[in-house]
Curated annotation (Swiss-Prot):
Assembly information from the UniProt record: The 4 large subunits of the cytochrome b6-f complex are cytochrome b6, subunit IV (17 kDa polypeptide, PetD), cytochrome f and the Rieske protein, while the 4 small subunits are PetG, PetL, PetM and PetN. The complex functions as a dimer.
PANTHER family recorded: CYTOCHROME F (PTHR33288:SF10), PTHR33288
Function: Component of the cytochrome b6-f complex, which mediates electron transfer between photosystem II (PSII) and photosystem I (PSI), cyclic electron flow around PSI, and state transitions.
Topological category with respect to the lipid bilayer: Single-pass membrane protein
Gene3D superfamilies per the UniProt record, alphabetical: 2.40.50.100, Cytochrome f large domain, Single helix bin
Subcellular location: Cellular thylakoid membrane
Record keywords: Electron transport, Heme, Iron, Membrane, Metal-binding, Photosynthesis, Signal, Thylakoid, Transmembrane, Transmembrane helix, Transport
Listed cofactors: heme
Name used for this protein in its record: Cytochrome f
One protein family per Pfam: Apocytochr_F_C
GO molecular function, one term: iron ion binding
Length: 311
């Protein structure tokens, strides 16, 4: 039943995306859910990079330390030039969308709405947070979102409590974040999107370039020996070749229309034991008191010595 509702959620999200976004390889972090048990490979690479081939920087901000059962915010920043437009699925130009994945330590999860302060409610308004799976609530997906409004994605996080969950322990943990702006270059099935460079499948001479009614272009390449091969270039990428031109296998037939990219960043967070902080404060207080007593004792000794010298 859980798997049914998960599939239903994905279907609704995809349907909404089709209604409100042009059909294209959007910044859909949930594509990874369908093909990967974990969004992070053994090498440390986040699987979103398999479809978003260009590398772009991101930033992630989390508190240095948090206490059990506390609510805090984690921020994934996805900067880019908002004046730039990307190629949409129909070949037209439009704004970039963004998406993010946040991999937290075990036990951390999205905070329930009734635990959010007003300021955090305002920062997270309009954002839908989705766990990677039913048993991986600590891995959170967001997107696609319009990049003009969400270059900073705020995650409201609830820290676990080792006092009530014995599987959780105090200590330092790794946090992994990934974020992308713009469409992917490859679909999950391995097929190129129209946000990619199209290349010559064989070496030969371009004998014809014919526009198709759907906006795509048929490029026919004839080798010296053998049959001609047709490469269909979808609407969007711009052709950089002409009829009669000789090309080698793998040569670019179009420009690279991609203006986006994916990035990932690692950081750390400490689940701090409040009792440890209390004992640390007691220790500092004891040290301070000892120093004060030593100073007072020293002054007392100096007074006695001064009194003895006066006789």
């Amino acid at each position: 039943m859980k798997h049914f509702f998960k599939s239903l959620t994905l279907a609704i999200a995809l349907a909404a995306s089709v209604l409100f976004w042009s059909p294209q390889a959007q910044a859909y972090p949930f594509y990874a859910q369908q093909g990967y048990e974990s969004p992070r490979e053994a090498t440390g690479r986040i699987v979103c990079a398999n479809c978003h081939l260009a590398a772009k920087p991101i930033q992630v901000e989390v508190p240095q330390a948090v206490t059990p059962d506390s609510v805090f915010e984690a921020v994934v920043k996805i900067p880019y030039d908002t004046s730039v437009q990307q190629v949409l699925g129909d070949g037209s130009k439009g704004g970039l969308n963004v998406g993010a994945v946040l991999m937290l330590p075990e036990g951390f999860k999205i905070a329930p709405p009734d635990r959010l302060p007003e300021e955090l409610q305002a920062k997270t308004s309009g954002i839908y947070y989705q766990p990677y799976s039913d048993d991986q609530q600590n891995i959170i997906l967001v997107g696609p979102l319009p990049g003009e409004q969400y270059q900073e994605i705020v995650f409201p996080i609830l820290a676990p409590n080792p006092g009530t969950d014995k599987s959780i322990h105090f200590g330092k943990y790794a946090v992994h974040a990934g974020g992308n702006r713009g469409r992917g270059q490859v679909y999950p099935n391995g097929e190129k999107s129209n946000n990619n460079v199209f290349t010559a499948p064989i070496a030969g001479t371009i004998t014809s370039i014919t526009p198709n009614p759907d906006g795509s272009t048929a490029v026919v390449i004839t080798p010296e020996n053998g049959e001609a091969v047709t490469e269909t270039v979808p609407a969007g990428p711009e052709l950089i070749v002409r009829e009669g031109q000789t090309v080698v296998a793998g040569a670019a037939l179009t420009n690279n229309p991609n203006v986006g990219g994916f990035g990932q960043k690692d950081t750390e967070i400490v689940l701090q034991d409040p009792n440890r902080i209390k004992w640390l404060l007691v220790f500092f207080a004891a040290i301070t008191l000892s120093q004060i007593l030593l100073v007072l004792k020293k002054k007392q000794v100096e007074k006695v010595q001064a009194a003895e010298m006066s006789f």
